[in-house]
């Protein structure tokens, strides 16, 4: 175990996926703290011009683009990824390769380029799902083994990539660690609550899945960013973070529907109170997913992984992050909800006006 008092300045920072939800919020926070930041993404940055912000538009699977992005950088935060929440044996090879090319090969490109460019610190964005294999997890910690049961490509690619990143710790002088968020929410979220809103507007939410006593945890985006930065600051020789993975969340396990209910009510809608067996719904969605890939019918209403999170406890301890990094959530769930509720009601109203077009299933997670 390293010394938690050892910390370092981040120097010049690269944020991959800097145009996305997490990435743009991270870039903004780093700029507010006075850092020199470079944003790397496939699309231009939505952020206003800033004297300490430069942007690189490019593809993480392109070696030349990646080399340009990492040149002169001291710390890399890797948030870019594709979210494919379906998987299993029936997925097409094209579907599988799309995820692996970005989430695994793209990560390897970035690590190797960073090593060659003299980057000192590399913080990877994984997921709490890397240890979720269809079992109840209550206050799970980082000693849990990686899952070997993959029902979605996102988890599968995150397991492979995290193992690689942590295995590269210390190679050519670059220290690495990994952050495992839970469901990420807050201003800019186009995934968690957008999916809830799509189903509410489509009239699909007739019942609730699983018991009210089942809990999961979430990661408010500014709590997550706080954890990212602390981890990077502790990537120092003899420090606590090198080669380590950390669960970073809000520290307040909640039932998903009870978490979402205030938002849905604020949007002028209601959630039902009738609940049904999650295991039955999960089996139905697994069958539907198989038919989707086998015969091309429409995607399931809810991905099997999402159903598991509704009927199985899945929440994780932040004790290791507290001990090693000094992490404490900056915002309670109540405080965070008050801050971002106007954003979510505006998003809902926009979706109503636009006819609630579905989010792209494999949108980059940034």
Swiss-Prot record:
Keyword Metal-binding attributed: no
Top-level EC class: oxidoreductase
Similarity comment: family membership: Belongs to the 3-beta-HSD family.
Other remarks on this protein: The degradation of testosterone by gut microbes containing 3beta-HSD leads to a decrease in serum and brain testosterone levels, causing depression-like behavior in male rats. The prevalence of M.neoaurum and 3beta-HSD is higher in gut microbiota of patients with depression than in those without depression, suggesting a potential causal role for gut microbes in certain types of depression.
Originating organism: Mycolicibacterium neoaurum (Mycobacterium neoaurum)
Catalytic activity: testosterone + NAD(+) = androst-4-ene-3,17-dione + NADH + H(+); testosterone + NADP(+) = androst-4-ene-3,17-dione + NADPH + H(+)
Enzyme Commission code(s) on record: 1.1.1.51
Single GO BP term: steroid biosynthetic process
Protein name as annotated: 3-beta-hydroxysteroid dehydrogenase
GO molecular function: oxidoreductase activity, acting on the CH-OH group of donors, NAD or NADP as acceptor
Function: Catalyzes the degradation of testosterone into androstenedione.
Sorted UniProt keywords: Lipid metabolism, NAD, NADP, Oxidoreductase
């Amino acid at each position: 175990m390293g010394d938690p008092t050892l910390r370092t300045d981040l120097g010049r920072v690269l944020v991959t996926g800097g145009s996305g939800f997490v990435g743009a919020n991270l870039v903004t926070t780093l700029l507010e703290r006075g850092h020199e930041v470079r944003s790397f993404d496939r699309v231009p940055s939505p952020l206003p011009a800033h004297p300490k912000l430069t942007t690189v538009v490019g593809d993480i699977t392109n070696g030349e683009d990646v080399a340009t992005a990492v040149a002169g950088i001291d710390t890399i935060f890797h948030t870019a990824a594709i979210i494919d929440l379906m998987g299993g044996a029936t997925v097409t090879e094209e579907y599988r390769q799309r995820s692996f090319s970005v989430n695994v090969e793209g990560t390897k490109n970035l690590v190797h380029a960073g090593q060659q460019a003299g980057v000192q610190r590399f913080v990877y964005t994984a997921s709490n799902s890397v240890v979720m294999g269809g079992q109840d997890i209550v206050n799970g910690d980082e000693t849990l083994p990686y899952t070997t049961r993959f029902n979605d490509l996102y988890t599968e690619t995150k397991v492979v990539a995290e193992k690689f990143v942590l295995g590269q710790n210390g190679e050519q002088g670059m220290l690495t660690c990994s952050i495992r968020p839970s469901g990420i929410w807050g201003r800019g979220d186009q995934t968690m609550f957008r999916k809830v809103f799509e189903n509410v507007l489509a009239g699909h939410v007739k019942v609730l899945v699983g018991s009210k006593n089942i809990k999961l945890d979430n990661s408010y985006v500014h709590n997550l960013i706080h954890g990212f930065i602390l981890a990077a600051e502790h990537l120092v020789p003899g420090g606590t973070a090198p080669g380590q993975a950390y669960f970073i969340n809000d520290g307040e396990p909640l039932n998903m529907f009870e978490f979402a209910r205030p938002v849905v009510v604020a949007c002028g809608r209601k959630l039902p109170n009738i609940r049904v067996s999650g295991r039955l719904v999960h089996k139905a969605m697994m069958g539907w997913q198989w038919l989707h890939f086998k015969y091309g019918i429409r995607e399931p209403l809810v991905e099997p992984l999402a159903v598991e999170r509704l009927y199985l406890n899945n929440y994780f301890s932040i004790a290791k992050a507290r001990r090693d990094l000094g992490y404490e959530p900056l915002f309670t769930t109540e405080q965070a909800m008050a801050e971002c509720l106007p954003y979510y009601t505006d998003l809902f109203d926009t979706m109503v006006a636009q006819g609630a077009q579905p989010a792209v299933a494999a949108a980059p997670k940034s």
